[in-house]
């Protein structure tokens, strides 16, 4: 009888939905899903760690611990082989320490795939998972290539029992695995590996539910799902639909769908009418046409619009396919898909191929990430070698002791150490913010030793930390406590070239053009106004510059949550009414934009 895995908490905690639900509501959703009968709740992964580190409110470990204390269902995490939750491979001792930290914080199920399907890269992590007593679910990524995807994955599956895997997961990040192929692949992998097989699928082609049912028919006994609003928005398999379909086929999943609809109602209250970029029809259509992850296509579209080149999206998508073929047909799972897309974007914008090579693509071609499924095009390999010195690939990744020394005492625990190892200065900034928050909590609590009151103070601090309010004051039973938002500005790390994750997007208050034709952009929240992504960086926009829809105008920080404010119209910035790093109120005028006509986007 097939069991279902729920990925709702992970999806709510990463882009493009990160920040839409307060932490308290996410924990409420987790408690509801805990009663639904899932085999596992997958609550974290690379996207969650990235979003949490950049938002600088709580550590990813704090989020996992908070969920663990509220649910009994086993918790899972999605990892990218030697990349773990980052964008660069890490050393073996960091891998081991990360797995140990995850297990100590309550993770029991580790879904682990190598972005290149080089399963030898799973050996160290697999051993660490086994040592920690976790379940090692080894993933194989399906991405359509030239020939032989099925045969290649079956051969890799034969190696997984020797690595200690307890289950094989077929992972389709693009939705290209049609039902009949899903049925064949699951059956062959199950026979070749002699292990149980699970099935994860996403993509805008619309075949996910049919592929999942075909996989179950072939013997898959674990299928990933999410609640209906997220399935619809992010092109996943709906738990409600799959459970009811299985029931109709006489294969009860044991799922209480009433609980799923209850969770869906909570989520819908927060994101029901707000647009999420991957759902845009033109993005979904292009993703399905080119067999690409919809989030990747959405990210490319954003970058092209920023360069006033939205009409070149199809040209870039064609180029992604060419670059992928020349790079040995690697799968499109993160971060490899982002690397290929970044290189293709450069080719189109520069109007020349391989005139510039990004470091990550160079590392991919030179083997730093592992062996690609097919041979690298010799011409491309030579071009990459000529464009860079031989030592472009760094020596072995930093060890734990190297990281500890460079952090200069900031890493006070193993879990902080591994965060710094993978996220560098961004993690260091997060840890400083968290320590400051803990200091404020301790100072407040020290003034009142009553345990019940102390807990209420902690909750009050969390409310201010998660919201955009400037100050909260309560008075009850003779106790008066006021918690005020700190006003000191904080910098942001550099944004990636192309990423499937983005900074939180705040809905702006952009009024319709009055008689003078100027659009007035007002602040949608109380916070601090930043004109640039980091101290010393150029501003997002200046007076006199032309902007396009979805182009970032500024950041509004509310309790260390950085929210992008984007243009809704194409036009020329006529005035900026707030200085950098100044506090703003709800509805305060920020920009005036004079609309201009632009060609429609593809």
Predicted features and spans:
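N-terminal small/glycine-rich loop or linker at the start of catalytic domains
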Residues: 1-19, 70-87, 130-144, 185-194, ...
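Glycine-rich phosphate-binding active-site loops on the catalytic face of alpha/beta enzymes
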Residues: 112-114, 172, 218-235
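Conserved, mostly hydrophobic/aromatic
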Residues: 12, 33, 112, 168, ...
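Terminal or standalone catalytic/regulatory effector modules within metabolic enzymes
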Residues: 28, 34-35, 39-52, 281-287, ...
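Catalytic cores of alpha/beta
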Residues: 151-156, 205-220
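Acidic, compositionally biased tether/linker regions
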Residues: 345, 423, 432-522, 602
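Structured functional modules or segments
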Residues: 500-602
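Active-site beta->alpha loop and helix N-cap motifs at the rims of alpha/beta catalytic domains
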Residues: 40, 45-156, 161, 167-168, ...
């Amino acid at each position: 009888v097939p069991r279902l895995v729920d990925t709702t908490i992970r999806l709510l905690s990463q882009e493009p939905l990160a920040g839409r639900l307060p932490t308290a509501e996410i924990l409420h959703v987790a408690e509801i899903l805990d009663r639904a009968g899932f085999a596992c709740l997958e609550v974290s992964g690379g996207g969650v760690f990235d979003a949490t580190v950049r938002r600088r409110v709580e550590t990813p470990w704090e989020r996992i611990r908070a969920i663990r204390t509220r649910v009994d269902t086993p918790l899972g995490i999605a990892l990218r082989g030697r990349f773990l939750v980052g964008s660069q491979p890490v050393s073996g001792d960091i891998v081991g320490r990360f797995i140990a930290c995850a297990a100590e914080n309550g993770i029991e199920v580790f879904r682990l795939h190598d972005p290149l399907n080089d399963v030898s890269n799973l050996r160290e992590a697999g051993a660490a998972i086994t040592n920690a007593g976790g379940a090692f679910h080894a993933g194989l990524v399906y991405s359509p290539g030239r020939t032989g995807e099925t045969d290649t994955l079956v051969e890799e599956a034969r190696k997984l029992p020797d690595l200690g895997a307890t289950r094989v997961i077929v992972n389709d990040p693009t939705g290209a695995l049609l039902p009949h192929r899903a049925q064949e692949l699951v059956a062959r992998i199950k026979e070749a590996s002699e292990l149980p097989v699970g099935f994860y699928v996403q993509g805008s082609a619309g075949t996910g539910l049919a592929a999942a049912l075909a996989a179950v028919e072939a013997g898959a006994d674990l299928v990933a799902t999410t609640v209906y609003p997220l399935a619809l928005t992010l092109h996943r398999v709906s738990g409600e639909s799959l459970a009811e379909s299985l029931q109709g086929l006489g294969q009860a999943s044991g799922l209480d769908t009433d609980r799923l609809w209850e969770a869906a109602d909570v989520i819908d209250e927060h994101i029901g009418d707000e647009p999420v970029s991957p759902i845009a029809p033109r993005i979904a259509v292009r993703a399905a046409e080119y067999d690409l992850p919809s989030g990747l296509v959405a990210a490319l579209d954003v970058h092209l619009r920023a360069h006033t080149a939205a009409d070149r999206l199809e040209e870039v998508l064609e180029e992604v396919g060419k670059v992928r073929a020349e790079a040995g047909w690697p799968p499109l799972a993160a971060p490899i898909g982002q690397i290929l897309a970044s290189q293709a974007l450069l080719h189109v914008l520069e109007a020349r191929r391989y005139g510039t090579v990004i470091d990550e693509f160079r590392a991919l071609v030179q083997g730093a990430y592992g062996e690609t499924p097919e041979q690298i095009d010799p011409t491309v390999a030579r071009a990459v070698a000529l464009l860079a010195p031989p030592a472009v690939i760094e020596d072995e990744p930093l060890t734990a002791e190297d990281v500890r020394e460079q952090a200069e005492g900031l890493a006070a625990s193993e879990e902080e150490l591994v965060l710094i190892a993978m996220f560098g200065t961004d993690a260091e900034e997060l840890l400083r913010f968290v320590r400051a928050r803990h200091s404020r909590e301790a100072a407040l609590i020290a003034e009142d030793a009553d345990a019940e009151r102390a807990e209420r103070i902690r909750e009050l601090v969390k409310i201010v930390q998660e919201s955009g309010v400037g100050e909260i004051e309560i008075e009850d039973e003779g106790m008066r406590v006021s918690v005020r938002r700190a006003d000191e500005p904080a910098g942001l790390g550099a944004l990636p070239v192309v990423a499937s994750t983005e900074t939180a997007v705040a809905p702006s208050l952009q009024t319709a053009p009055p008689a003078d034709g100027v659009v007035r952009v007002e602040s949608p929240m109380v916070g601090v106004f930043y004109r640039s992504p980091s101290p010393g960086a150029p501003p997002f926009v200046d007076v006199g510059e032309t902007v396009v829809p979805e182009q970032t105008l500024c950041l509004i920080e509310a309790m260390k949550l950085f929210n992008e404010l984007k243009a809704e119209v194409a036009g020329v910035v006529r005035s900026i009414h707030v200085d950098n790093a100044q506090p703003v109120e709800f509805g305060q005028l920020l920009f005036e934009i004079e609309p201009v006509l632009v060609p429609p986007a593809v």
